[in-house]
Amino acid sequence: MRVLVLGSGVIGTTSAWYLRQAGFEVTVIDRQPGPALETSFANAGQLSFGYTSPWAAPGVPKKAIGWLFEKHAPLAIKPGMDLAQYRWLWQMLRNCTHERYAINKARMVRMSEYSRDCLNELRAQIGIEFEGRDLGTTQLFRTQQQLDASAQDIEILAQYGVPYEVLDRAGIIQAEPALAHVDGLVGALRLPRDQTGDCQLFTRRLAQMCVDAGVEFRFDQDITGLEFDGDRITGVRIDGKLETADRFVVALGSYSPALVAPLGMRLPVYPLKGYSLTLPITDPAMAPTSTILDESYKVAVTRFDDRIRVGGMAEVAGFDLSLSQRRRETLELVVSDLYPKGGDLSRAQFWTGLRPATPDGTPVIGATPFRNLYLNTGHGTLGWTMACGSGRYLADLMSARQPQISTEGLDIFRYGQYGHAPQQENRTCVLPAR
């Protein structure tokens, strides 16, 4: 049975790997000249299985008003003429309650913890290397209010059996010795089972292993639309030519909604623009040990072999990929405060990418109203964290195997209005130019 996977980021590539392991004939299509050249290219590098949290949280609406006037605000909204932007923001606001936050975080932790197990199993099986470290994540709190607010997260972590430690200043320094000079830290939440690693390196190496296993990758090819007949996809238009298969997987990140919208599916995925700096390490003893998350700025500082990756922030600004000097200054501020002697900012590489975010934080994985069309998208800032679990979960669904975790609340049907596909024949669904 032939499957076309649309997209070769970390989500598309892990999907291809697990589908091939399940016995499918797999072809991956992407417009880029290679894998992991968009959102997966230079993300924060954190595998934050325990830290997993939705952006839609209690208190965010009130904070967002204050952030409008802050230079280094973690979240920025740039209003445009896109109705999808306003619809997405409204849905996000509706998820900023204690009840919805608990439901959404529990779903995300379920997938993230499963993904950790899948990644560990994959590493043991194929020995893939990606500058990975298994030294945990430390979330820094600069105010007592931030520390107190972590209580709800801790409750959910305990519910799922995720190990954690609440650290005082001495505990922070023990975990991350290079932070001994930093004043004003009131505490931290440490998640010892979290990991780090270079997402792009992982994806490129896994793509090569996919090829060795028989997966075909076709690059520099534009996906221009879908065709369907009744409740089945009959083919995908690639550079204007129709390509047929038995099943199709949409793993196009922020561009997924544009492809499926003409099918009558309103997929609530919107790009959250993020930024990163990558700088060479100058003094290993003064660099991070693993991943640090600065709660005040929502910025992560991650250690690779000989590099520091600083990433974070979220802009609701559509598909704008311009680089903001103001955002660069925020990243430089955080890394200079925490690790002033750790890396060379004068040689830093500045990057931006679009994370495909749902308003509730949970990705959209699984079946659709079309019998042979599947989704694997909407992971937001946690695509790298959830990639292996999402790929394995999808392959199990498509193989009619019982997934190892609950399927509750993970597919598009949780949004309610997608139960019926349009019953038109031989219609072409055109994907706008990207």
Curated annotation (Swiss-Prot):
Keyword Amino-acid biosynthesis assigned: no
A single MF term (Gene Ontology): D-amino-acid dehydrogenase activity
Disulfide bond annotation, renumbered to this chain: none
One protein family per Pfam: DAO
Entry keyword set: FAD, Flavoprotein, Oxidoreductase
GO BP, sorted A to Z: D-alanine catabolic process
Superkingdom to which the source organism belongs: Bacteria
Residues that bind FAD: 3-17
Role this protein plays: Oxidative deamination of D-amino acids.
Record protein name field: D-amino acid dehydrogenase
Gene coding for it: dadA
